[in-house]
């Protein structure tokens, strides 16, 4: 039976510790639905837990008209550092036999759905260990006050990372990610109709996000995509990401297309979608179950 708990009183992040985990999945969900992930992705989480994965779920604050994705990503990154540090501290005191497993970065990977995929991409950029290269990418794609605001947010996140650097390592980069119906273009679903108000809505907007991905040539080397043939929301973004990711230095590049629509990962037949993950690296994505 899956049971989520809070590891920090002032953090919305929920964790389900599996008694015998073979991996640790970190999850960020879709626009609106990502603010109540335990209910919206109930079937997905039960499936993954049954497959022997511990889960770390990062809920999004319910702010339907907040398109400042940089600020949200920065808050997620700071919370991520704090949660990871607390997991290590807690296990040291209460379950030292499990400490090595949860302290090993190779046991962690990311799973995102829809807008949650954009946050995972931003998190990898924000946590880049080469600050000079990261800043060069930001200067190439952002201007004026936007760049100033991002630099301020990054300094705040970097300060939090320095506090816990002895306990954790670079755990965004080099952790495999699987993106389900990735959506980076600020599309909103109203009465089952996908609406993309403006290519310049949001921060970073569609143009800026694409620029950041295109210029981050050292990143995104461990990413797989799953898309759906009836998805009218993420189709353009999937095409863009597939084109970009094929240029990265993959050992295996995965893009699987399934029957279904954009919100298929929230359905009750999630076992038809669930990835069969292998024990190490991007090889985890070499097999995916078919419908």
Feature roles, as predicted:
Residues 26, 56, 109, 176-178, ...:
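Hydrophobic/aromatic beta-strand patches that form the interior of the parallel beta-sheet core
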Residues 184, 189-291:
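C-terminal catalytic-base region of ester-bond hydrolases, centering on the histidine
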Residues 59-65, 182-184, 229-230:
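Short beta-alpha junction loops
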Residues 6-63:
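Short, surface-exposed "cap/lid" segments of acyl-processing enzymes
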Residues 58-92:
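Catalytic nucleophile-loop/oxyanion-hole region of alpha/beta-hydrolase
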Residues 77-78, 85-87, 93-217:
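Serine-dependent carboxylesterase/thioesterase catalytic core
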């Amino acid at each position: 039976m899956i049971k989520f708990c809070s590891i920090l009183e002032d953090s919305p992040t929920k964790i389900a510790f599996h008694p015998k985990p073979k991996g640790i999945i970190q999850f960020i969900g879709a626009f609106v639905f990502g603010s109540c992930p335990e209910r919206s992705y109930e079937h997905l989480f039960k499936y993954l837990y049954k497959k022997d994965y511990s889960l770390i779920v990062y809920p999004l604050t319910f702010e339907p008209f907040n398109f400042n994705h940089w600020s949200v990503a920065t808050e997620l990154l700071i919370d991520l550092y704090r949660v990871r540090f607390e997991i290590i501290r807690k296990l040291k005191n209460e379950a030292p036999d499990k400490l090595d497993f949860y302290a090993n970065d190779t046991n962690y990977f990311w799973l995102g759905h829809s807008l949650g995929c954009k946050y995972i991409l931003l998190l990898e950029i924000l946590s880049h260990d080469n600050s000079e290269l990261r800043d060069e990418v930001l200067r190439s794609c952002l201007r004026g006050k936007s760049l100033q605001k991002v630099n301020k947010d990054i300094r705040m996140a970097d300060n939090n990372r320095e506090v816990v650097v002895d306990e954790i390592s670079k755990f965004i980069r080099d952790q495999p990610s699987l993106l389900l119906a990735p959506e980076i273009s600020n599309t909103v679903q109203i009465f089952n109709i996908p609406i993309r108000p403006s290519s310049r809505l949001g921060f970073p907007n569609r143009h800026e996000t694409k620029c950041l991905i295109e210029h981050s040539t050292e990143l995104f080397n461990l990413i797989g995509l799953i898309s759906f043939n009836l998805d009218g929301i993420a189709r353009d973004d999937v095409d863009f990401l597939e084109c970009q990711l094929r240029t990265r230095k993959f050992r295996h590049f995965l893009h699987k297309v399934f029957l279904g629509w954009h919100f298929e990962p929230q359905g009750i037949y999630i076992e038809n979608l669930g990835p069969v993950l292998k024990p190490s690296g991007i090889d985890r994505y070499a097999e995916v179950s078919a419908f």
